[in-house]
A protein has these predicted regions:
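Active-site-proximal beta-alpha core segment in soluble small-molecule metabolic enzymes
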Residues: 62-122
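Catalytic cores of large soluble enzymes that bind and process phosphate-bearing ligands
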Residues: 33-40, 63, 109
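A generic structural signal for short
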Residues: 36-37, 59-60, 79
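Short linear motifs at secondary-structure transitions and domain/linker junctions
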Residues: 8-12, 59-60, 104-107
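Generic N-terminal amphipathic, Lys/Arg-enriched alpha-helix
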Residues: 17-36
Length: 122
């Protein structure tokens, strides 16, 4: 499988938030779907930031928890020093959404994955 094909497949998986204006039945949601109350999410991000700041610590949340570049951007806007990604595919999604401070927490050992990484790095 060529790295160009794999790379294009990774970029095809991008998503944007959809603001629901009316309730939607769970059975009608496209899956997978991350459904949350944005104000509560923002409050939780700020609480984490404030708790760690009170201890003199910064934070670098792991995107594996939410797998969502939009949430990673909110965390960065709240003061995170960066975000972590377990796999290259997670890092590619974050990079292609405009994030730059990404720590890949697993080793990249194959030549094809290194080629993909080189294509997405600025």
């Amino acid at each position: 499988m060529s790295t160009d094909f794999v790379f294009s497949r990774l970029l095809d998986k991008q998503s944007e938030p959809i603001q629901l204006t009316a309730p939607v039945a769970v059975s009608e949601l496209p899956t997978p779907a991350l459904v949350l109350e944005r104000s509560i999410l923002q409050r939780n991000i700020e609480s984490m930031r404030d708790f760690l700041a009170a201890e003199g610590k910064g934070f670098r949340p792991h995107s594996k928890t939410h797998k969502c570049p939009v949430i990673a951007k909110l965390q960065m806007e709240a003061g995170a020093v960066g975000v972590c990604a377990t796999k290259l595919s997670e890092a590619v999604a974050l990079i292609s959404s405009g994030l730059t401070e990404i720590l890949i927490t697993s080793p990249i050992v194959s030549k094809s994955k290194l080629e993909i990484l080189n294509k997405v790095l600025p």
